[in-house]
Amino acid sequence: MTSTSQLFDPYAEALMAIAREQGLEDRFGEDAALFRSTLAASADLRHLLENPTLFSSQKKAVLNQVFGSSVHPLVLNFLNLLVDRNRIAFLDGIADRYQALLRKLRNVVRADVSSAVPLTEAQVQVITEKVKQLTGAAGVEIESQVDADLLGGVIIKVGSQVLDASLRGQLKRISISLAA
């Protein structure tokens, strides 16, 4: 069975090669973010693109209508190529992989932050600086989400590293040490 990275990587790498050739890495990254947010917001669009009974011309027409004026023409051509190769259903994964390649190119890390309450700008700044110190990255992309089960504090995930500074995590560690 083919792993998803074997499906996503060649297309994401090809898109990155075109972007680098044209000096449009960041623009294509913005387009990839637009794809991901649009697909996340529209289940109908996702289902339409995944529908094997629709003709390629119909899918291309929808993509042109939805993204045509918003994305770079080379990116629109790329979308049409994905339709022609029956890979358009993998657009979200390809866009995610492209963004990962862009972060690597720019020496930027992604930090997934869970907190009990929404983070303030000051808290985001502190977390950004701390992650930069820990990773040596030039920049940090913060993806935050609220998890009321944490009670307080934050959990920060960067790659395979996890920093648990939550009240729930502290209580769990105390419980384990008391049980020992």
From Swiss-Prot:
Function per UniProt: F(1)F(0) ATP synthase produces ATP from ADP in the presence of a proton or sodium gradient. F-type ATPases consist of two structural domains, F(1) containing the extramembraneous catalytic core and F(0) containing the membrane proton channel, linked together by a central stalk and a peripheral stalk. During catalysis, ATP synthesis in the catalytic domain of F(1) is coupled via a rotary mechanism of the central stalk subunits to proton translocation. This protein is part of the stalk that links CF(0) to CF(1). It either transmits conformational changes from CF(0) to CF(1) or is implicated in proton conduction.
UniProt key word Secreted: no
GO annotation, cellular component aspect: plasma membrane-derived thylakoid membrane; proton-transporting ATP synthase complex
Membrane topology summary: Peripheral membrane protein
UniProt keyword Thylakoid present: yes
Alphabetically ordered keywords of this record: ATP synthesis, CF(1), Hydrogen ion transport, Ion transport, Membrane, Thylakoid, Transport
Alphabetical list of PANTHER family matching this protein: ATP SYNTHASE DELTA CHAIN
Main location: membrane
Oligomer and partners: F-type ATPases have 2 components, F(1) - the catalytic core - and F(0) - the membrane proton channel. F(1) has five subunits: alpha(3), beta(3), gamma(1), delta(1), epsilon(1). CF(0) has four main subunits: a(1), b(1), b'(1) and c(10-14). The alpha and beta chains form an alternating ring which encloses part of the gamma chain. F(1) is attached to F(0) by a central stalk formed by the gamma and epsilon chains, while a peripheral stalk is formed by the delta, b and b' chains.
Protein's name according to its UniProt entry: ATP synthase subunit delta
GO molecular function: proton-transporting ATP synthase activity, rotational mechanism
Localization annotation: Cellular thylakoid membrane
Short name of any one Pfam family annotated for the protein: OSCP
Assigned protein family: Belongs to the ATPase delta chain family.
Organism taxonomic ancestry: Bacteria, Bacillati, Cyanobacteriota, Cyanophyceae, Synechococcales
